């Protein structure tokens, strides 16, 4: 191997290792002692050709072990609540809520790495992007073959305030990019943050019991 080529290979390997260490360190620092998160998000969905299908924004809350709340405010309201046993999807405009058992689909979400980082290497093949992108250090997660995941690949981008961005590519090439801001660590959640009780007049679809 030529000296220049050998140097290039070694330099690339060293840089990639450093980038991975930096990104993994960002994850470890962000998740240390983490029991819950509350923040704002903006989301963009594009098809396999890069055409924008939807822009949305709202609030997200996560808590160990399996609770989450996605509260979409724009362009239309929608509420998704997981209480650890069931997932409720409420559409105010339709006055309808759909409820189903909470299963592996949620447990295999990339965000599981935040509130249960011990599952990261168990569920995913973890790699790094060799150089920062958008000013962030990135970890790429590819579901292992025996993992019942609903996506092909996901990436977590970390900045000075922790997780700043998440990208998810599904089976048909659709890409969802979520930017996070205003994270509050281990907040005192209201008692009903991860509970949903249908109001009178709301049509319930599914098994609520």
Curated annotation (Swiss-Prot):
GO cellular component: outer membrane-bounded periplasmic space
Keyword vocabulary terms for this entry: Chaperone, Periplasm, Protein transport, Signal, Transport
Compartment list: Periplasm
CDD domains reported for this sequence: LolA (cd16325)
Domain of life according to the entry: Bacteria
Gene3D superfamilies documented for this protein: Lipoprotein localisation LolA/LolB/LppX
Disulfide bond residue pairs: none
Role: Participates in the translocation of lipoproteins from the inner membrane to the outer membrane. Only forms a complex with a lipoprotein if the residue after the N-terminal Cys is not an aspartate (The Asp acts as a targeting signal to indicate that the lipoprotein should stay in the inner membrane).
Family: Belongs to the LolA family.
NCBIfam families membership: lolA
SUBUNIT field: Monomer.
Name listed for the protein in its UniProt record: Outer-membrane lipoprotein carrier protein
Species lineage: Bacteria, Pseudomonadati, Pseudomonadota, Gammaproteobacteria, Lysobacterales
Gene assigned in the entry: lolA
């Amino acid at each position: 191997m030529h000296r220049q080529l050998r140097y290039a290979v070694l330099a690339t390997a060293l840089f990639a290792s450093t980038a991975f260490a930096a990104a993994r360190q960002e994850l470890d620092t962000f998740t240390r002692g983490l029991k819950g998160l509350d923040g704002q998000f903006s989301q963009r969905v594009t098809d396999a050709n890069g055409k924008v299908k939807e822009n949305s924004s709202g609030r997200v809350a996560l808590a160990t072990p399996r609770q989450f709340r996605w509260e979409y405010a724009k362009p239309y309201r929608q509420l998704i609540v997981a209480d650890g046993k069931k997932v409720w999807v409420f559409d105010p405009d339709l006055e309808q809520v759909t409820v189903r058992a909470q299963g592996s689909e949620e447990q295999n979400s990339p965000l599981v790495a935040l509130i249960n980082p011990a599952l990261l290497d168990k569920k995913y093949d973890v790699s790094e992007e060799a150089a920062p992108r958008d000013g962030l250090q990135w970890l790429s997660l590819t579901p292992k073959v025996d993992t019942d995941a609903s996506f092909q690949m996901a990436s977590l981008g970390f900045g000075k305030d922790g997780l700043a961005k998440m990208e998810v590519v599904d089976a048909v090439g659709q890409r969802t990019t979520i930017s996070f801001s205003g994270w509050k660590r281990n907040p005192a959640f209201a008692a009903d943050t991860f509970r949903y009780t249908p109001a009178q007049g709301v049509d319930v679809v599914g098994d609520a019991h």
